[in-house]
Amino acid sequence: MMAQQYKYNPTDYVDYLCESMMDFYAALPEGNALRLSGIWERIYFDTKQAMKEHFLSPAERDDIIAYYEELIPDA
């Protein structure tokens, strides 16, 4: 099995954001748009919290949520 390369390494981020990113990557092979959208919502709020706690800049947050949104297949 080849390892998939992703733009963001979850372990580079605060624990709660790392967890939601890892959940997203784990669900990605299934291609379930509804499930991925739910996890994306968690990433959305986790990045907002990380930004409030100064773990992310606003630009980093925007890039992360846009990247994960692009990975969700069309329903």
List the predicted regions and their residue ranges.
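Acidic, Ser/Pro/Thr-rich low-complexity regulatory regions
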Residues: M1-A75
